[in-house]
A protein has these predicted regions:
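Noncatalytic carbohydrate-binding groove/subsite architecture in carbohydrate-active enzymes
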Residues: 1-112, 171-177
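Active-site lining segments that contact anionic ligands and/or coordinate catalytic metals
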Residues: 16, 65, 122, 150, ...
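Residue-level detector of conserved catalytic or cofactor/ligand-binding positions
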Residues: 178-186
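A structural signal for short secondary-structure junctions
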Residues: 61-63, 118-120, 181
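Hydrophobic pocket-lining residues within nucleotide cofactor-binding pockets
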Residues: 73, 130, 183
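Catalytic cores of secreted or luminal carbohydrate-active enzymes
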Residues: 112-129, 134-177
């Protein structure tokens, strides 16, 4: 990680205003603690890319700040095994139609907080897919419904406006096998 971003920025710094990021998180192991700690992975990813942008800026004695566009992010794993069973070349099969649970909503909320916490550099953030395919809204012949991940997204879109305040509460260490644990700030 990082060498591609550094190389591209080193060559094209003057032409770049935003660096695009994509990230999806899943819970294939069924470990709630590790899954919910994925927002720490997102936080580290953003911080790492910001450091790369700033390193290239310093090397070039640049004036402009390169910001981030988190073009694609979401929770995606529920439909993986089901989609592997699809026949090839079938016309418009239902696929990637994850049905989300409360755990997923908690992670989406944490990811949104992470994006807000980095609002100084993440200027654009787009949840990947909004209807049917890994989406907060599902449709069928009989209507539409909101999934669990809809609610943190909706609440953030309504209340996450204006100036982002860096308020933090220090909590005990959160044990996770995937993401290095440190005192967690919420």
């Amino acid at each position: 990680f990082g060498s591609w971003e550094y190389t591209v920025l080193d060559e094209a710094y003057d032409q770049v205003d935003y660096l695009s990021l994509h990230q999806y998180y899943g819970n294939a192991s069924g470990d709630t603690a590790d899954f919910l700690a994925s927002s720490k992975g997102m936080d580290d990813f953003i911080s790492g890319v910001v450091s790369i942008c700033d390193a290239v800026k310093a090397k070039k004695h640049g004036k402009k700040q390169i910001n981030l566009s988190f073009d694609e992010w979401n929770v995606w794993y529920h439909s993986n095994e089901q989609d592997k069973k699809l026949e090839k070349w079938v016309q418009a099969p239902h696929q990637l139609e994850d049905v989300y649970n409360f755990e997923d909503a908690l992670l989406v909320g944490s990811m949104l907080i992470t994006l807000l916490r980095h609002a100084d550099r993440v200027k654009i953030a787009c949840m990947a897919q909004l209807v049917n395919v890994i989406a907060p809204i599902m449709t069928s012949d009989t209507g539409a419904w909101r999934q669990t991940i809809f609610y943190p997204y909706m609440l953030t879109s309504v209340f996450g406006r204006g100036t982002v305040l860096n308020t933090q509460v220090l909590t005990p260490i959160y044990l996770s096998l995937i993401h290095i644990s440190e005192p967690t700030r919420h």
